[in-house]
From Swiss-Prot:
Subcellular location: Cytoplasm
Keyword Nuclease: no
Major site of localization recorded for this protein: cytoplasm
EC number: 6.1.1.11
Family: Belongs to the class-II aminoacyl-tRNA synthetase family. Type-1 seryl-tRNA synthetase subfamily.
Its job: Catalyzes the attachment of serine to tRNA(Ser). Is also able to aminoacylate tRNA(Sec) with serine, to form the misacylated tRNA L-seryl-tRNA(Sec), which will be further converted into selenocysteinyl-tRNA(Sec).
Molecular function in Gene Ontology: ATP binding; identical protein binding; magnesium ion binding; serine-tRNA ligase activity
Origin species: Escherichia coli (strain K12)
InterPro entries registered for this protein in UniProt: aa-tRNA-synt_IIb (IPR002314), aa-tRNA-synth_II (IPR006195), aa-tRNA-synth_II/BPL/LPL (IPR045864), Ser-tRNA-ligase_type_1 (IPR002317), Ser-tRNA-synth_1_N (IPR015866), SerRS_1_N_sf (IPR042103), SerRS_core (IPR033729), tRNA-bd_arm (IPR010978)
Protein name: Serine--tRNA ligase
Residues annotated as binding L-serine: T237, A238, E239, E291, S391
Positions annotated to bind ATP: R268, S269, E270, E355, I356, S357, S358
Superkingdom per UniProt: Bacteria
Amino acid sequence: MLDPNLLRNEPDAVAEKLARRGFKLDVDKLGALEERRKVLQVKTENLQAERNSRSKSIGQAKARGEDIEPLRLEVNKLGEELDAAKAELDALQAEIRDIALTIPNLPADEVPVGKDENDNVEVSRWGTPREFDFEVRDHVTLGEMHSGLDFAAAVKLTGSRFVVMKGQIARMHRALSQFMLDLHTEQHGYSENYVPYLVNQDTLYGTGQLPKFAGDLFHTRPLEEEADTSNYALIPTAEVPLTNLVRGEIIDEDDLPIKMTAHTPCFRSEAGSYGRDTRGLIRMHQFDKVEMVQIVRPEDSMAALEEMTGHAEKVLQLLGLPYRKIILCTGDMGFGACKTYDLEVWIPAQNTYREISSCSNVWDFQARRMQARCRSKSDKKTRLVHTLNGSGLAVGRTLVAVMENYQQADGRIEVPEVLRPYMNGLEYIG
C-alpha cells in the first residue's frame, strides 16, 4: 500500500509514476473523496466537542437546581448526529482504503519504462549454451524414458498441470531443494523456516495477494464449526508466510537484516494461462520453490536486492546452467515491486531462456499493510521496514534445466557434481 500522505499531498506526481507501469490513477475521484473526508473529519470533531461541552453543562445546571431536560435532549440529539457522522466517515475511509489496496507500488526511477515483457532489458549473461551433436530431447521425453515423470497418473489423481515424480527423477528433485537450502543457510546467511501451507486472510492482505488477486489463489472451504477463523488459502509462494512473520512487529534496527528461507510447495490457479505451456513442468498448479526473504532498513534495500539476486545466481552457477539476468520494465513488474530482476535459464529443447527466479524490492509497500516497523537505537523512533523476496530457485524448472542441459546422446542424464553428495554419489540417471 502506498503512503496515504503521498496520495493526498502529491496525487499528480503519484499518478505520473503509476502511468509508467500502465496504471491510471483516478486523481479527481480520490481528490473528491479526500475533500469529503476532511469535511466529515471536522464535522465529527466539532460535534464531539459540542456534545462534551453540553454534557458538562448538564452537571453544572443540575448543581444549580435548574431544569436539565432541555440540555439532556440537546445532548441526545448531538449524540445521534455524531453517530451518523462517524458512520459516514468510517464508510468513506473504508472506500478510500479499498481503492488504495488496488493501487500498485511506484516504480524506482531506474526501472526502464515499458509496456510488457518485450520491453525488459537484459543486464548480463553467464555461461554458454551447450551445442549438442544429437537431437535434443525435452524433459518430458527424458522423464518418460526413465519412468520419472508421470503426468497421466497425476491426471487420474487430480487433473491437468500436476505431476507424479518417481525414482531417480524424484530423488534429483529432492536433491535440488536440499542443495539450495544448504547453500542459502550455510553460505548466504539465511535462517531456514518451516511454515504453514495454508494462510489466513490477514496474511494474504499483508503481502498484497488480497484483495486484487483472489482469483489466482486456491481457497479452502471454511470448516462449519470454525467458519469465522478457517477461511484459508493455499500459499502461492513462501514469500507470503515468511514476510508476514514480522507483521505487527517492531524490530530493533540492530537486529536487521533478517534473512529467511523456506522450501515449500506453491499453489497457483494460473488464471489467464489457458493454453500456455501445457506440456511438462514449466507451468503447474503445484510446484516446489526455495524462497528467500529479507527484512531490512529502508536505506539498505537496493543493496539487498543486488545481494539477493546474486544468491539466486550462485545456485545456477554452481549447477553449471547458462542463464541471463534481466531487469523488468515498469509494465511487467509485479503488483508490489518497485524493482525486479528476473533470471532466465537456458532450456535446450525450447532453444530459449525461461524464467527461473524473480527477485524484487518491495520498499515499504508490504510493511505498511502489515504495520512492520523497526526502531532506531539512538532516538527510539520507529519507521516502516523494507521487504524483499526472491526465488532461490523454482525447483521444478531447475529440474527441467538440469535434465535437458545434462542429457546424453543415449538418453542418460548426468548428475551435476554439486548434487552427487545428495544422491549417494550417483553420476548418471539411466
